[in-house]
Amino acid sequence: GSLGNANIDPYQYLETMTASGSASIAKSSVIINGQNVPYTSVPSLIPDDITWEKVTTYNIGLDLDLFHNRLSFTGDYYRRNTTDLYTVGPNLPQVLGSAAPYGNYASLKTKGWELSLSLRDSFNLGGKPFSYSIKGMLWDSRSWITDYYNETGDLTTYYKGMEIGEIWGFRTAGIYASNADALNGPAYNFFKNGEMFRAYAGDLRFVDVDGDGIMTKGNRTLSNHGDLEIIGNQSPRYQYSINMSLNWNGIGLSMLWQGVGKRDWYPWTESGFFWGKWNRAYNSLMKTQTGDNVVRIDKSTDNWRVTNMDKNPYWTRMVSLAANRNDGPLTWENDHYLQDASYIRLKNITIDYTFPKHICKKLRLEGLKVYLSGENLFTHSPMFKHTDMFDPEVITSGDSDFAASTTSGLNGTGNGYSYPMLKTVTLGINVTF
């Protein structure tokens, strides 16, 4: 079927005059007859052929119920094409005095699938009715830009062929073991205090992808991106949930597990809870930034060398503001500090007991049930090996309470500043009179 998109401001086809501030007419600084002269702005250009965004979905599915409905399977595969996306159009000559108009200039393609498998049964166990159910779900989707006005191939915005969520950055090959080792590596075209950055023992070994002997980011365009490559993707992949429950002799147990099988996240330079003192010298030292997790350098000679290379340290030589300069050595995304933000979480576990009817009758009750429930009690993520300061479930969600956005631009980086999912334990009783 085909649908429109209602999530767009109405009356976009009308040329409207706007003014700064909340008033429809602004006040200028020019005073005539004791009054500020009002003014408004010239309306932006609007294409003549603005129309609805259109979403067309093709779907094929399979449903199976086997063994008297004890085993159920559902599978779906879909393709969704979004056309006439309302976005910015081609640039206009500056002499025209108007910004590029918005119109139906882009399109998007999405492919995805969903699977679910359920198993349920009931029988007598120890002379008492016993029942259980297990349901697992797994789903995935990917989206690509199929049309977008980006004549220069600028990587800081959308472009034709882009997969939503992709992260561009540098490849790395470990850490330099000595100054002599670093001198044999490519020069860094990262300007710090106006000078070419030089690598030392304990710094990251960046990979010279284009082989020109210098680490650069080019013009950050498709045709000239220097040594930048796609190193990851922040979109959640292979999302899943497992729901289990059982009941026997008045005792009930249920669990819900949920997670993401694949997702990348890169900590932005202002993510102080990740970078610690690598961001600013007065920041706290994170507990994972101690011991053999950090390079140890022998500076007794001019040829500095790392003394704990056999421990495979994760954190490079500590350089103040290394991750907080416009062109510092750790400012640009790289696969060494790219975080695996996949996770599995116990969303809920509940244990309950329903009292027998004869006990309820003695208490003059219709029903009595007590329960103990916990939420978000357990979470595991590969990211916790390097930092446990972030909640992987909401790491890209963002909170309006934080001034800085959780994500920065289109490159999948971000502060990760989101309120974590709270752990809660509830003890309750249900009474029916």
Predicted feature descriptions by range:
Residues 260-369:
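Extracytoplasmic gating/loop element in the C-terminal half of outer-membrane beta-barrel translocons
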Residues 231-268:
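Glycine-rich, aromatic-lined ligand/substrate-binding cores of catalytic
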Residues 79, 90, 257-261, 270-271:
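A short beta-strand motif that forms part of the nucleic acid-binding face
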Residues 1-171, 329, 333-433:
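Extracellular/periplasmic, surface-exposed regions of secreted and cell-surface proteins
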